[in-house]
Regions:
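Short, non-ligating residues that shape and space the ligands of small metal-coordination modules
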Residues: 18-22, 54
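Short acidic-glycine loop/turn motifs at beta-strand connectors
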Residues: 27-29, 49
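Cys/His-coordinated zinc-binding microdomains
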Residues: 13, 49-54
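C-terminal structural segments of small proteins and small subunits
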Residues: 55-85
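Short linker/helix segments within small regulatory modules
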Residues: 30-42
Length: 85
């Protein structure tokens, strides 16, 4: 029996498999970082790997709300860059 790894997107609030989401983690020193390995320790928030969720998340500040900390534009740009190739 395999264990499912479902997480909720901070933007659209849908439950999805962990692999379908980006993880942003708040590491020591209160610095948000994109965690592509899903293994960095710290408070994490998830957002879908599509441009609509990223745009909505930026507009609604959903990642900031989930992490209780500001998230820099560079992280959103990095996620968009990964999606667009």
């Amino acid at each position: 029996m395999s264990k499912e790894h479902k997480r909720m997107c901070s933007s659209c609030r849908q439950m999805k498999d962990k692999e379908e989401l980006f993880r942003i983690v708040l590491v020591k020193g209160n610095e948000p970082k994109l965690d592509l390995s899903y293994k960095i320790q710290g408070r994490g928030a998830y957002i879908c790997k599509n441009t609509e969720c990223i745009k909505t998340g930026l507009k609604k500040h959903s990642l900031e709300r989930s992490l209780s900390h500001s998230v820099k534009q560079e992280i959103y740009d990095e996620m968009s860059g990964i999606i667009n190739g």
